[in-house]
Amino acid sequence: MNIENSLKELGLSNHNIGTSTGSNYFSDGEKISSYSPVDGKEIGTVSTTTFEDYNKVIESAQSAFKFWRTVPAPQRGEIVRQFGNKLRDLKEPLGVLVSYEMGKSFQEGLGEVQEMIDICDFAVGLSRQ
């Protein structure tokens, strides 16, 4: 799998919004470019966060925390399990992106994604204690 196909499968484009609350996206900040150390090519651009948008994200996160802490641990664990499954589904394109963006081998990129999957599995186990 090449980087172009991986970016497409991950839903990434030439320009991406860098700030989100999960339901709201903010793109008013300046754009910065990400370059691959592999070949020096631009991978894409991302919008930075303005001070005002940052405050909105923090407020949203604080509000979400107040709700999230009331959700029973097994239900939270189920959501984390779904995250882990999505990471499993996208392991190869994520591994390609990590390797290209960080200048790592493909196997190292896959290893980085596997670590995220393992953390999700660990958290699911904790939710059942």
Where in the sequence are the language-model features?
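Glycine-rich loop-to-alpha-helix module at the N-terminal edge of alpha/beta enzyme cores
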Residues: 43-129
